[in-house]
From Swiss-Prot:
Pfam family, one: Ribosomal_TL5_C
A biological-process GO annotation: translation
Quaternary structure annotation from Swiss-Prot or TrEMBL: Part of the 50S ribosomal subunit; part of the 5S rRNA/L5/L18/L25 subcomplex. Contacts the 5S rRNA. Binds to the 5S rRNA independently of L5 and L18.
Spans annotated as Disordered: 1-24
Originating species: Rhodopseudomonas palustris (strain HaA2)
Keywords: Ribonucleoprotein, Ribosomal protein, RNA-binding, rRNA-binding
GO molecular function terms noted in the UniProt entry: 5S rRNA binding; structural constituent of ribosome
Organism lineage string: Bacteria, Pseudomonadati, Pseudomonadota, Alphaproteobacteria, Hyphomicrobiales
Source taxon at top rank: Bacteria
Keyword Transport: no
Name of the featured protein: Large ribosomal subunit protein bL25
Amino acid sequence: MATVMEFKATARPKSGKGAARAERRAGRVPGVIYGDNKPPLPISVEDKDLRLRIQAGRFLTTIFDVVLDGQKHRVIPRDYHLDPVKDFPVHVDFLRLGEGATIRISVPLHLKGLESAPGVKRGGTFNIVTHTVDLEAPADAIPQFIEADVSTLDIGVSLHLSDIALPKGVKSVSREDVTLVTIVPPSGFNEEAAAPGAAPAAAAAAPAAKAGAAKAPAAAAPAAKAGAAKAPAAPAAKKK
């Protein structure tokens, strides 16, 4: 479930590059609240506060109540821009969330059962195809992550998004069934040799092959004699 946190903001009476630079010199980051069929609302937030929330992780999947002049605006961050040289935030965008709103969002993928997977025990290696999953979820019930159990995967087997039970009200936005993870075989891996029971079967097949080879010439000999006996004698040549 989504956790709602408060974020204090101040209204920006002016817009434009000059006003934005003035906000940054004052230790604030310009931003905007938009969406829900309402006019954009220019704001600014404390630079230090914004940095801490970004560095804490999952910033773009966290719902906030932006407190502005005593009024709360339910929002979710949609984007933020960093200075290309000094790497500090220079702008932040918030999407206003109306009642009953649903949003599209990328959620981290967490895997469990990595060490107990049969494919790993046989020398295989996990290949994580994607680290995030694109979902559509209710704004008040955004999952912090999606968990996938890979404890039963064997070599050559893949886990897809359709194999996972998503939370109630959450669905995938991808048109295709997304491959999440596979187990790659080790170098020189022989599936038949590695299959359980392959060695006993091969051992049992060897004596049988030898016995068949020994019997083949014996069976061929009588057939050759019979062929010789049945062959008609060549007619004698007539004297002239």
